[in-house]
Amino acid sequence: MAMTQTENQTAPQQHIRIFDTTLRDGEQSPGVALNHAQKLEIAHTLARMGVDVIEAGFPIASPGDLEGVSRIAREVRGPVITALARANRADIEAAAKGVEAAEKSRIHTFIATSPIHMQKKLNLEPDAVIERAVEAVRLARQYVDDVEFSAEDATRSEWDFLSRIFKAAVEAGATTINVPDTVGYTTPEEMRKLFAYLKAKLPAHVILSSHCHDDLGMAVANSIAAAEGGARQIECTINGIGERAGNASLEEIVMAFHTRRDVYGYETGIRTRELYRASRLVSRLSGMPVQPNKAIVGDNAFAHESGIHQDGVIKARETYEIMNAELVGREAAVLVMGKHSGRAAFRKALTDLGYGDIPDDKVQHLFGRFKDLADRKGQIYAEDLRALVDARSDVPQTFSLEGFQITSGMNMMPVAFVRLHTPDGPVDATAHGDGPVEAAFQAISKITGISPTLESYRIQSVTRGDDALGEVSIHVRHGETQLNGTGVATDIVEASARAWIRVMNMIVAGMGKNKAITQMTP
C-alpha cells in the first residue's frame, strides 16, 4: 500500500546511490566519441550535481581510454571513481592503474552468467564461470577495498545460479553486487521479485545495484522496481544515452523519486537544479540531441499547447504541472541582457546562470561573441547565454573563422568564400559544393589541408523566435578516429562552418577517439 504524504513526512528517507555511467556505457552509443577534455568536463558536472559514483571508462579498451580515466581520477573529487574490467588480469590491472589516483576508487568487474552467454560466448561451464568471477574479485581487492561485481545478462540467468555466483563474489570481497538487464528484456514485476529474492540470499551489508537497458522502453520503470525490491544503487546515464536503445535515464529516475517520495520514500542527494545543464552539456558533447518530448529535460516537458491546459496553468501551475521547471534548472524566457550591456553585467548574468567558474580569459572571448549576437538580435535571453556558453571551445584554436560569403541560388552551383585565421595569418579559399554548407566545408578543408568524412549532420534551434540561435552537430571520421563537432550561430552556414572548424582543430590537437573494443558490456 502506498504511503500517504503525511506518513512520508515522518518516515526516514532511504538513500539510493546514483551510479552514473554516461562516460562508459553512454559513450558506447553509436556515433559518440568523447575526448579527454570533454569527459573531464562531464565528470566535473556530475560531481557538482552530487552523483555517488562515476564510471569513468573502460581502461583496457585503448591507451586513450586509460589516460581519460586516470585524468578524471586525478582531478575529480567527491564521487567514487570506478573503471570497468572484464574478469581477467589484464583488464583488472588496467582498471586499477586508471583509478589509482582517485580520492575514492572502485574496480567494477563482470562476467556473463546467462546460459546463452556462457555457452555461445564464453564456452565455459557454470562452475568455471564462478571460478573466474572469484579470481577477478580477489585480484581487484588487491588494489582497492571497494569492488563491484556484475553478472552480465543477469535477467536471463537462472536465479539459483545468480545466487551462487553472487555469494561467491561477496565471499571473495565484492562490496556491491550489480544485476544488469543487459538486453532490456525484463519487466518491472520480474525485476522487483528478482531483487527481493537476491536480497534474501545475500548478506545485509552488500549493496544491490541495478543496471537497466531500454530495449523495451522499461529501463526507468525496471530501475524503480529494483529499488522497491531492495536495490540501493541505480546505474544510469544522462539523457538515457547508451548502447542500442540506451540506458535508464538519470534525470527521470531522480525526479520520479523526488516527485513521488510520498510513494517511494527514497532520496538520492542529487542537486536537481543541475539536471538541465548536465543534459544540455552531454547532448552537445555527444552530438545526440534530446527529443523534444523527453521527460524532465525535453523542450516540451513544461510546454502547454492546449487552451484548456494553458488557462489552468495560468490560474494555478499545479493544475497541469507536477513539478516546477526551475527545480530541474529550467528558467523562464527572462530578458537578461541587451546590446548596451557591459562586461560586468555579462559576468553577473553568467554567474546567475550557474557559470561563475568560467575563467576570465574565457569570459572575455564569450563577451565578444555576446556583443556580436546582441548586434544581430538586440535582446538576449537566458537561453541565448546558455547556448553561447555551451558552444565555447575547449579545443586549441589553430584555425578560427574570420569571415565567409556564400553565393547560391536555384539552378546554380553554390560557391563559398571563406577566410580563416591560421598560424600563418589570414588565409582565403573558394570552393563549390552540392549546397552552401558543403561548399563552406570544402573551402575550409582547402585551407586546413584536412578532409575528414562527414558521417552525420544535425541542426536544431536552441533558442526561440525568428532570430533564434541554431546549433549544428556533426560526426566525422578521420582515418580510424571519430570526432564530434558543434557550432552555434543565428546563421546556419556559419554554425556549420564553426562545427567543421572545431573538428579541424580537434584533429590537429590529436583529440579524436578511436573505439578499440566493441565487445558488449553490462
Swiss-Prot record:
<dbReference type="Pfam" id="PF08502">
    <property type="entry name" value="LeuA_dimer"/>
</dbReference>
<comment type="function">
    <text>Catalyzes the condensation of the acetyl group of acetyl-CoA with 3-methyl-2-oxobutanoate (2-ketoisovalerate) to form 3-carboxy-3-hydroxy-4-methylpentanoate (2-isopropylmalate).</text>
</comment>
<keyword id="KW-0479">Metal-binding</keyword>
<dbReference type="Pfam" id="PF22617">
    <property type="entry name" value="HCS_D2"/>
</dbReference>
<dbReference type="GO" id="GO:0005737">
    <property type="term" value="C:cytoplasm"/>
</dbReference>
<keyword id="KW-0100">Branched-chain amino acid biosynthesis</keyword>
<feature type="binding site">
    <location>
        <position position="247"/>
    </location>
    <ligand>
        <name>Mn(2+)</name>
    </ligand>
</feature>
<keyword id="KW-0464">Manganese</keyword>
<keyword id="KW-0963">Cytoplasm</keyword>
<dbReference type="InterPro" id="IPR013785">
    <property type="entry name" value="Aldolase_TIM"/>
</dbReference>
<dbReference type="InterPro" id="IPR054691">
    <property type="entry name" value="LeuA/HCS_post-cat"/>
</dbReference>
<dbReference type="InterPro" id="IPR000891">
    <property type="entry name" value="PYR_CT"/>
</dbReference>
<dbReference type="GO" id="GO:0030145">
    <property type="term" value="F:manganese ion binding"/>
</dbReference>
<dbReference type="InterPro" id="IPR005671">
    <property type="entry name" value="LeuA_bact_synth"/>
</dbReference>
<comment type="pathway">
    <text>Amino-acid biosynthesis; L-leucine biosynthesis; L-leucine from 3-methyl-2-oxobutanoate: step 1/4.</text>
</comment>
<dbReference type="GO" id="GO:0003852">
    <property type="term" value="F:2-isopropylmalate synthase activity"/>
</dbReference>
<feature type="domain" description="Pyruvate carboxyltransferase">
    <location>
        <begin position="16"/>
        <end position="276"/>
    </location>
</feature>
<feature type="binding site">
    <location>
        <position position="25"/>
    </location>
    <ligand>
        <name>Mn(2+)</name>
    </ligand>
</feature>
<feature type="binding site">
    <location>
        <position position="213"/>
    </location>
    <ligand>
        <name>Mn(2+)</name>
    </ligand>
</feature>
<dbReference type="Pfam" id="PF00682">
    <property type="entry name" value="HMGL-like"/>
</dbReference>
<keyword id="KW-0808">Transferase</keyword>
<feature type="region of interest" description="Regulatory domain">
    <location>
        <begin position="400"/>
        <end position="522"/>
    </location>
</feature>
<comment type="similarity">
    <text>Belongs to the alpha-IPM synthase/homocitrate synthase family. LeuA type 1 subfamily.</text>
</comment>
<dbReference type="InterPro" id="IPR036230">
    <property type="entry name" value="LeuA_allosteric_dom_sf"/>
</dbReference>
<protein>
    <recommendedName>
        <fullName>2-isopropylmalate synthase</fullName>
        <ecNumber>2.3.3.13</ecNumber>
    </recommendedName>
</protein>
<keyword id="KW-0432">Leucine biosynthesis</keyword>
<feature type="binding site">
    <location>
        <position position="211"/>
    </location>
    <ligand>
        <name>Mn(2+)</name>
    </ligand>
</feature>
<dbReference type="InterPro" id="IPR013709">
    <property type="entry name" value="2-isopropylmalate_synth_dimer"/>
</dbReference>
<dbReference type="InterPro" id="IPR050073">
    <property type="entry name" value="2-IPM_HCS-like"/>
</dbReference>
<keyword id="KW-0028">Amino-acid biosynthesis</keyword>
<dbReference type="InterPro" id="IPR002034">
    <property type="entry name" value="AIPM/Hcit_synth_CS"/>
</dbReference>
<dbReference type="GO" id="GO:0003985">
    <property type="term" value="F:acetyl-CoA C-acetyltransferase activity"/>
</dbReference>
<dbReference type="GO" id="GO:0009098">
    <property type="term" value="P:L-leucine biosynthetic process"/>
</dbReference>
<comment type="subunit">
    <text>Homodimer.</text>
</comment>
